[in-house]
Swiss-Prot record:
Keyword tRNA-binding: no
Function recorded in the entry: Involved in the transposition of the insertion sequence.
Annotated family: Belongs to the transposase 11 family.
Leader peptide range in chain numbering: none
GO biological process, one term: DNA transposition
An example Gene Ontology molecular-function term: transposase activity
Keywords: DNA recombination, DNA-binding, Transposable element, Transposition
PANTHER family, sorted: BLR1914 PROTEIN (PTHR30007:SF1), PHP DOMAIN PROTEIN (PTHR30007)
InterPro entries: Transposase_11
Domain of life: Bacteria
Protein name per its UniProtKB record: Putative transposase for insertion sequence element IS6501
Source lineage: Bacteria, Pseudomonadati, Pseudomonadota, Alphaproteobacteria, Hyphomicrobiales
Length: 130
């Protein structure tokens, strides 16, 4: 059993939302549920796994933000991307690095998803307190 974590972080790398999915689920279908209802979003920065026209339309219409999503190599039309903004994607990578400093999360010691997410939420609270 593998579990994948999808997260939304703010501009300084603090977690706003986190959602677990089974490891074989795709990344892009999870994005709209994570992003819905966020306020004050200027840019959404994501990697190529989240590159889809419907997600770009959702970001533009519902969030009134611009999508800075790396282009999937299989895409025929290439949308523009501001590479200076895209470099800020390291914030999500740094967040997952901070999260995996907690051994129970990194090694996935918990047998149930409820217990695992309990420790993930506790670690997120600890990250907020630092």
């Amino acid at each position: 059993m593998t579990t994948k974590l999808h997260a939304v972080v703010d501009a300084i790398g603090l977690p706003l939302r986190i959602k677990p999915t089974p490891g074989h689920y795709g990344d892009c279908p999870q994005a709209s549920s994570l992003l819905s209802g966020l306020k004050g979003v200027g840019h959404v920065i994501a990697d190529a796994a989240y590159d889809a026209d419907h997600l770009r339309a959702f970001i533009a219409s519902n969030l009134k933000a611009t999508a800075q999503i790396k282009v999937n190599p299989t895409r025929s039309s290439v949308p523009t991307i501001d590479w200076r903004l895209y470099k800020e994607r390291h914030q999500i990578e740094c967040f997952f690095n901070k999260l995996k400093r907690y051994r129970r999360i990194a090694l996935r010691c918990e047998k149930t998803l409820t217990a695992f997410m309990g420790f993930v939420h506790l670690a997120c609270a600890m990250i907020w307190l630092r």
